[in-house]
Structure formats: C-alpha cells, structure tokens
C-alpha cells in the first residue's frame, strides 16, 4: 500500500470507528422514565461518596433482620457515612455500566397492613401498603371520624354493640391516586438514577415483598445488567409505632466493586382531601428549615414559607424547594409536610425517641417538585423528593431513611413527644387565615385564646360552649372602661350636635355653593363647644374586638381539639339526635344537615343554620342602642350611612353563614352582652346631666388637654394654614 493510500485509509477507519461507538452508545441506552414528576435540572458540583459498610450481603432476601440495611452508627444511633470526598474531576467519575434494568417479580395477593381499626388501646390507625412503588395505599384512623354522625354511631357500637357502622365513617387521611391511568401511592418509589441511567421503580412488578410481619413490611428492588448480574439492591422497610408515626427505612446497596453515582427520586406527601363543607380550602404545603448559621444549631423556622394549595395548582409543574430566598440565606431543609384543615403528613430525618440525631434533611432531599393533575376544581398535587447525586463506593450503602408523621394537627402530640419536639413540628399548627386576612390574624393572639379556652374547658366549666361564653365576658370586662367612655362621648356629642343644628343650617343657607366653607365654619363651632369627631368613639370597642374575632375565627376553624365537640354538654343531641351545635367547628345545623352539601355562591351549604340569622337581628337591635349621632351634612351622606347600616345587618350574617358555630356563638353572645352593657351605661348617663362644655373666649386659642382634642386641634390648625397658603397663591397676579 502506498504512502498516499495509507493517508487516505487511516482517517476513513478512524471515522468509521468513532461512528460505531456513537451508534452503540445511542442505541444501547434504555429509557425507563415517566413524566409523572418534573425532571431535575439543577446540577450538583460535588457528590457525596459512601464507602463500604463492614458487612454487605449481595443475595440476602430471606428475613427483614437479614435484609434490612446494616449501616455504621454513631453514639446517638444515627447512620453515618464513613467518608465524603470531592469528586468534581470528570476523569474520576465511575465508568458507565452496560444496559441496566430492574428485575421483575410476581404480584402477591397477601394484604400488606400495619396497625388496626379495632384494637384502640394499641393502634391509632391502620395503614395499607402496595407493591406498586412499595408505597402507602391508604391510611385510615381508628378513632377519628368523617362526621359527627359517624362518631356517634361508632361510639354507640363500641359501647352497646349492635349493627356495625360503615368503615367509611372513619377518617381517611390519604389514598392512592390514579394519574394518567397509573396508580400513584403516597411516598412510593419513582425512579433511581445509576451512572446517568434512569430506572423506573413505580411498577408493582419492580418490587419483591420480602417479608410481612406485624411490626414491619419489607420490599426489595434489584438492579441487574444485561448479563443478569446484580448491580444494586434497594431496600424499603415500613414500620409503625403505636401513635401516628411511621418509619421508612430505605437504602441503596452497591453490589459491585466499583463506585457508582446514584440519585433517588420518590413521591412525597400528596395534597390531602379538602374539608366536607369546603367553606375555605386551607390545604397547604409547609417547610421547616434551619438557618444557615455556619453549622451552629439554630431554631427551626417554618411560618415564613407557606405554600397554599390554590397557589400550588397555578403551575402544572414547579420546584417548590429550594426557593430563591432559601438559597440566598443558605437555609437547610429539616422537614416537609402537606396539611389540610386538621391533619398533616410530614417527612423528616431520622431522630431517636430521645430527640437525638441530625435535624438536617439535605443529604436525603435536595429538591422538592410538584405536579398538578386532574380537572379544574378537582386537582391533585403530587410532590417529588429528589436526593442529591451521591457516589457510593464499591460494596457501600447509601442510607435514605426518613421518619413520617401522619396524624392530626394536635399540639398535645406535636408539642410534647419526640422527635416532633426536636423538629419543632408544633409549627404545623397554624391558626392563620390566608389571603387578605393573613396580615389581620395575629398568631400570638390566637395562641393565647387557645390557652384560655383550653384552661376553661379542662379545669373550669368542662364544656367548650360555656368556655366561649366566659371568654366573651372576659373580653367585654377588659373593654368596659373604653366602652363606657365612648358611650359618654357619644351622648355629649349628640347633645352638642342637636344644639348646633340651627347654626349649621344657617351656614348652609349662607354658603349654599361652598361646602368647604360650611365645613370649616362647622369645625370652628364644634371647637368653641369643646367637642370634635375624634372624641366620638362609638365604634372603637367593635374595632378593638375585630382582632379577637379574626383570631378566634382562625382558632375555631383550625383547632383540632374543638373538632366534632358539642356545646352545652351535648344537651341538644339528647333530643332525638338533634345536630344543633353538635360540632362547634362547623355550622350550627339548627334544622338538620344535608346528605350532600349544596353549592351556594362561594360555599357548600351543609345545613340550615339559625345563629347567623339571630346575629343579624342582634346587629339591628344593637344599632338602635349604640349608633352614634349622624354627622351627615347632605342627603347623599345620609343615604350612604343607611346603606352601611343595612350592609352590616345583612352582609355579616351572609358572610358567616357557614362559619364555625363557635365563632357565631361568640359574636352573638358578645353583641347581646354589648346591648345590655349599653343600656346600663345609658341609664347612668341619664342620671347625670351632661351639658355641652362651651369654651370661654380666652380658652378658644388654647389646645385641649386630652390627646384626641390635641390631635384634632393640630389637624385643624394645619388645615387652616393650608387654606390660607392656597388663598395667598390665588391672590398673586403677574404684572406686565
């Protein structure tokens, strides 16, 4: 072969070889991904490296004790990694495997259940698991019910026997979802990425049920190459304590002698069911994190980031953690939860019963995403938990275990038991309305009212209804001095306005086309008689009670302790199972309940209620006693005031028609006490003559002694100077 021919042949052979490598690489990749969760797009600069555990079994599938991952532990009992090193150098990355796949297994018909609905002394719930994704099929509580009727039926059955009520009456916390004709269990596995090869683990045949015991259910998924050689195993073991806690012990075992880079992706807590009445949809996604304080232990924060369900469904897919602010502040994730009005599912790192262990979740969950499915009005939000890319050394184990809380938002549990205390999960209990009312709801005030109501119920009157009435008396007593002063000021103001009415009429006739002049002269007259509108504090007691009403609204709406609790020792339920005030957290249902809620405007009406109607009548009567003297200076203003009074009588009851009956009971009682208080103050005023205080000529220029009077005088003086300055500007003329 000539030299010239070799120069032509060698490049041709190199091109053929390179093309062959590209084609083999392209056609040998197997796509196992699905589109249920948004793909991770963030890159990770460094990867954790997990070195081999002391003992690693590559074929262990017999019992949970043998198959459960064995990791090294520190003094606190938490699994640790032997070493972590920087592996940013591309040449140091593990070599790619051939085509990987998931070993398939036969389906089992055996029930996969932990807990019980019958043994109340031992279990609080019953959890069903599924081979699909080795996740949770459903969780149902044993002693928490959907409705008051269901609660009464089951309590009667358990005490007196008879026909067993339906299991459907017990509260269903979570159920598997069907998305695009595919079953999605809660907290089920989604996929694993090994050396950039994505392997779907969401099918039932991907998992082998290794063992079923009363204290745990163990699943195994095996990753093999094209030669059927086992490359890795994924272990998932579910256990249940005797309260509302579950433990998910899961790990990835590298069965080879070389390093592999893995990333774990699973489903997180989904959106929970909405309340039956749907008065307000308060489903939320919550986060707890430690502040980035250079490794120092910091309080776990949570209330600054609350993702409402209504905001989550605006985007069909989104990344909800980390946020822009959390990246800037270097916040470290500690827990993630999905909640509705009364319940929550939270995931968090492993912490012992003594509250010891790391509170950081970042080595297991680096990113959280959402996907929205379902038609408008019936959306479901699925969440995805992405682990960081981690290098697992040959024979090593990557532990991705986590704890789970699946229970009520009850502070007696979250504020007194571990590991919830260490993680500050008590902040899941948030007595706060959303949207515009969020800034009006003072969390500290709602917490204080919760303490007062709880003390009254447990140690004083032993009934939530009477506790609310006593709370009314406490608040009205505190506000009585202000109420009395406002009533006296209202009476004095009314008498002065009656005496000044002829003078004001003269001013209107004198300046018919200059209302500002009339208003200014009227202010001068009021100043001469020692009164001003700021002294008329007739609405101040109501405004001071508004924060209490809003805080109490949020408290009674979200407080689990009041859920399905009756008022006045259940006396109304003794009359033929009358549902009136059977549940202070829902409407009063004076005329019974509807089997299916009826849609009306923004609410689902669950029954016909009487307390809001009585509240409207009380408001009307209250205006007769506490309305201040009208300051209308024109027919238009007078008609506007009438409209406002009518709206208060009509709109308040309409807005609160489906509100918790505990709140309407509070407002109704407070308004009734206010009328009686007003009558007593009026009798006191009538017995003491109150005459207008006419200012002396030498006192007209002096400022009043009271704060309101001084503020009024300063405002009038500033207004007078402003008018004078404008008059001077208008009188200036430019000469030619």
Label every PLM stretch briefly.
Residues 460-471, 607-611, 637-644:
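Membrane-interface starts of transmembrane alpha-helices
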Residues 250, 395, 477-552, 619-657, ...:
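Membrane-interface amphipathic helices and adjacent TM-edge segments
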Residues 11-25, 552, 613-617, 650-651:
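Core hydrophobic alpha-helical membrane-spanning segments
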Residues 554-618:
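Conserved catalytic motifs of ABC-family nucleotide-binding domains
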Residues 461-463, 654-664:
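Transmembrane helix interruption/hinge and helix-loop junction motifs
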Residues 1-473, 477, 688-736:
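Membrane-protein biogenesis/insertion across secretory and organellar systems
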Residues 22-27, 453-458, 547-567, 621-627:
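Juxtamembrane "helix exit" motif at the C-terminal ends of alpha-helical transmembrane segments
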């Amino acid at each position: 072969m000539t030299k010239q021919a070799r120069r032509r042949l060698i490049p041709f052979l190199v091109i053929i070889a390179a093309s062959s490598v590209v084609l083999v690489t392209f056609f040998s990749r197997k796509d196992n991904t699905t589109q249920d969760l948004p793909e991770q797009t963030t890159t990770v600069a460094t990867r954790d490296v997990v070195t081999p555990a002391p003992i690693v079994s590559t074929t262990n599938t017999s019992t949970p004790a043998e198959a459960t991952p064995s990791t090294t532990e520190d003094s606190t009992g938490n699994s640790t990694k032997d070493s972590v090193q920087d592996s940013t150098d591309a040449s140091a990355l593990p070599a790619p495997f051939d085509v990987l796949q998931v070993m398939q297994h036969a389906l089992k018909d055996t029930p996969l259940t932990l807990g019980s609905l019958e043994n109340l002394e031992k279990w609080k719930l019953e959890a069903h698991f599924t081979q699909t994704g080795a996740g949770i099929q459903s969780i149902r509580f044993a002693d928490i019910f959907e409705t008051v009727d269901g609660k009464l039926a089951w309590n009667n059955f358990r005490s007196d026997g008879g026909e067993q009520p339906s299991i459907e009456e017990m509260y269903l916390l979570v159920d598997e979802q069907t998305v695009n004709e595919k079953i999605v269990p809660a907290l089920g596995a989604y996929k694993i990425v090994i050396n950039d090869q994505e392997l779907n683990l969401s099918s039932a045949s991907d998992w082998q049920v290794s063992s079923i015991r009363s204290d745990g259910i163990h699943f195994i998924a095996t990753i093999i190459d094209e030669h059927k050689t086992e490359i890795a195993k994924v272990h998932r073991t579910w256990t249940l304590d005797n309260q509302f806690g579950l433990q998910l012990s899961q790990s990835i075992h590298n069965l080879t002698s070389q390093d592999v880079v893995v990333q774990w992706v699973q489903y997180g807590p989904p959106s929970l069911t909405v309340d039956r009445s749907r008065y307000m949809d308060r489903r939320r996604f919550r986060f707890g994190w430690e502040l980035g304080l250079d490794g120092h232990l910091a309080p776990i924060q949570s209330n600054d980031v609350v993702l409402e369900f209504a905001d989550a469904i605006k985007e069909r897919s989104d990344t909800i953690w980390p946020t822009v602010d959390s990246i800037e502040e270097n916040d470290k994730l500690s827990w993630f939860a999905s909640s509705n009005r009364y319940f929550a599912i939270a995931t968090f790192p492993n912490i012992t019963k003594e509250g010891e262990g790391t509170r950081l979740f970042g080595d297991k969950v680096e990113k959280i995403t959402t996907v929205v499915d379902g038609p408008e009005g019936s959306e479901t939000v699925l969440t995805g938990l992405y682990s960081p890319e981690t290098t697992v050394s040959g024979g090593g184990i990557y532990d991705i275990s986590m704890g789970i809380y699946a229970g009520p938002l009850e502070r007696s549990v979250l504020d007194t038991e571990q590991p919830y205390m260490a993680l500050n999960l008590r902040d899941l209990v948030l007595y706060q309305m959303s949207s515009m009312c969020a800034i009006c709801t003072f969390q500290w005030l709602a917490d204080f009212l919760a303490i007062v109501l709880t003390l009254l119920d447990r140690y004083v009157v032993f009934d939530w209804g009477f506790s609310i009435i006593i709370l009314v008396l406490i608040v009205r007593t505190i506000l009585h001095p202000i109420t009395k002063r406002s009533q006296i000021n209202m009476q004095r103001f009314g008498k002065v306005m009656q005496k000044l009415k002829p003078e004001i009429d003269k001013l209107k006739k004198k300046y018919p086309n200059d209302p500002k002049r009339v208003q200014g002269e009227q202010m001068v007259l009021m100043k001469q008689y020692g009164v001003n509108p700021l002294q008329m504090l007739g609405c101040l007691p109501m405004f001071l009670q508004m924060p209490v009403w809003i805080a109490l609204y949020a408290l009674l709406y979200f407080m689990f302790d009041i859920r399905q609790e009756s008022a006045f020792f259940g006396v109304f339920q003794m009359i033929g199972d009358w549902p009136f005030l059977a549940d202070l957290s829902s409407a009063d249902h004076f005329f019974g309940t509807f089997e299916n809620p009826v849609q009306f405007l923004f609410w689902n009406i669950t029954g016909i209620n009487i307390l809001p109607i009585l509240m409207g009548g009380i408001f009307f009567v209250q205006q007769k006693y506490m309305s201040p003297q009208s300051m209308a200076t024109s027919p238009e203003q007078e008609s506007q005031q009438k409209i406002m009074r009518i709206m208060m009588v009509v709109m308040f009851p309409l807005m609160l028609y489906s509100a918790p009956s505990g709140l309407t009971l509070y407002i109704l009682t407070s308004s009734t006490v206010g009328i009686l208080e007003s009558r007593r103050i009026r009798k006191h005023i009538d017995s003491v003559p109150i005459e207008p205080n006419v200012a002396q000529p030498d006192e007209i220029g002096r400022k009043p002694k009271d704060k309101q009077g001084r503020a009024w005088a300063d405002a009038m003086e500033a207004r007078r100077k402003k008018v004078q300055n404008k008059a001077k500007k208008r009188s200036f003329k430019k000469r030619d």
